[in-house]
């Protein structure tokens, strides 16, 4: 997930009413048994939720068997169990479908299993492994593969394996014939309008959904596109996500939004130089790198990062065919704004693993060494040795910077 400093929401007002205390019948025999959290302002200690959120879970009655689809976070187990018990005796539950095992969806699972020990948890192989390390006790489990089904008597559930949306364990559950897709985190949003659980009861939440996508799914764009391909030819009349409103009006709109946000942008080769320079020395080096990289067929732009927003920086990281960082040492460390940039690397879908490093220092010079370790740890290749300058760069250092820019630029173009 993306830290709070990496995502800045542009969205809007919040309505306050009483939260939903009871269950909601979505379709005959299909119930919402989730929990509303309209006051939440930071999700998982990581990013802002101006509109709160919901933890959606569902109970499905068949002619012969009963299934629960996902649970809620552990702190809301009492409310959750009250809703379950208002519909069925827990010991009569046959299946617990775990589409995703992150604690906001599995936190109540351990307690639920105590109430229905004969129930079978249905999940992917990865989810079974994760649950073993979350529950630390035995449980009945049925591992499913792509296309497997479960029959509830007059209703059938089909499972669609979609890893890394946004954990390795994720799957969709489709209620066949009724064309309802349970997607856990995918296609949802952190949005709660208390007492209103359907998307046609609330304002358009496209901004909230985009912000949610940006914070959670942006590093997994290829996986989003693969998942959309798996359901492209299915009839879908309703999407039941784990966060935000149930999408019964125009469900394909949410899918198409996720797909559009995940598609790559192609507009020629780009090399970006990102630097910070309190005293102008690293900036002189950045100018030299840019001169060296300025060859036909490549767009080269140098950015002082203090002039850019976090969203602008993340866009640049994602679009680049090569990244060259200019980092001075300040108090034996990388300056915080540049640490933030290096942290953003894990929050986007990168198309390059080629990087360069340069920077100035006065007497210790740790910053470039730290950055080199960070980049190599993320799988980046540095085809040119790091260039460092003690205070003001000499003519020889400037020449090395120009050569760095030229060498990396030529490498980008040679890759085609």
Summary of predicted features, one role per range:
Residues 166-170, 186-219, 252, 262-267:
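Active-site-proximal loop/helix segment associated with metal-binding centers of metalloenzymes
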Residues 23-85, 172-175, 179-183, 282:
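Conserved beta-strand hairpin/beta-sheet module of binuclear metal-dependent hydrolase folds
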Residues 75-122:
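Active-site metal-binding motif and surrounding structural segment of the metallo-beta-lactamase
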Residues 193, 203-239, 243-246, 288-303, ...:
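FMN-binding flavodoxin-like domain, especially the glycine-rich phosphate-binding loop
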């Amino acid at each position: 997930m993306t830290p709070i400093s990496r995502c800045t929401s542009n969205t809007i007002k919040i309505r306050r009413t009483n939260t939903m205390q009871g269950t909601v019948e979505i379709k005959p025999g299909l119930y919402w048994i989730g929990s509303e959290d309209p006051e939440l302002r930071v999700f998982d200690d990581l990013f802002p939720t101006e509109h709160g959120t919901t933890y959606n879970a569902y109970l499905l009655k068949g002619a012969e068997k009963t299934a629960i689809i996902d649970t809620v976070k552990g702190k809301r187990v009492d409310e959750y169990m009250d809703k379950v018990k208002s519909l069925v005796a827990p010991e009569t539950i046959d299946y617990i479908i775990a589409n995703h095992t992150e604690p906001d969806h599995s936190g109540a699972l351990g307690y639920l299993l105590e109430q229905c020990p004969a129930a079978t948890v249905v999940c992917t192989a990865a989810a079974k492994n994760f649950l073993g390390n979350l529950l630390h006790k035995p449980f009945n489990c049925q591992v499913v593969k792509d296309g497997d089904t479960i029959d509830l008597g007059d209703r059938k559930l089909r499972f669609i394996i979609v890893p890394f949306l946004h954990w390795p364990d994720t799957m969709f559950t489709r209620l066949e014939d009724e064309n309802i897709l349970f997607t856990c985190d995918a296609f949802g949003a952190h949005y709660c309008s208390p007492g209103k659980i359907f998307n046609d009861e609330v304002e358009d939440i496209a901004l909230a959904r985009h912000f949610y996508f940006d914070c959670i799914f942006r590093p997994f764009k290829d996986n989003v596109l693969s998942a959309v391909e798996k359901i492209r030819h299915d009839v879908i009349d309703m999407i039941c996500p784990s966060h935000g409103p149930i999408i019964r009006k125009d469900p394909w709109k949410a899918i198409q939004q996720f797909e559009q946000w995940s598609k790559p942008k192609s507009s020629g080769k780009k090399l970006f130089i990102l630097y910070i320079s309190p005293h102008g020395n690293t900036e002189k080096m950045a100018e030299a790198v840019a001169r060296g990289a300025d060859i036909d067929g490549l767009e080269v732009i140098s950015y002082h990062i203090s002039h850019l927003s976090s969203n602008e920086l993340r866009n640049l990281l994602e679009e680049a065919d090569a990244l060259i960082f200019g980092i001075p040492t300040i108090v034996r460390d990388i300056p915080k704004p540049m640490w933030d940039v290096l942290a953003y690397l894990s929050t986007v879908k990168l198309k390059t693993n080629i990087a360069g490093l340069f920077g100035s220092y006065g007497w210790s010079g740790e910053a470039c060494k730290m950055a080199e370790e960070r980049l190599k740890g993320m799988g980046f290749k540095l085809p040119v040795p790091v260039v460092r300058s003690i205070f003001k760069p000499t003519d020889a250092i400037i020449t090395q910077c120009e050569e760095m820019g030229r060498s990396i630029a030529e490498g980008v173009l040679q890759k085609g």
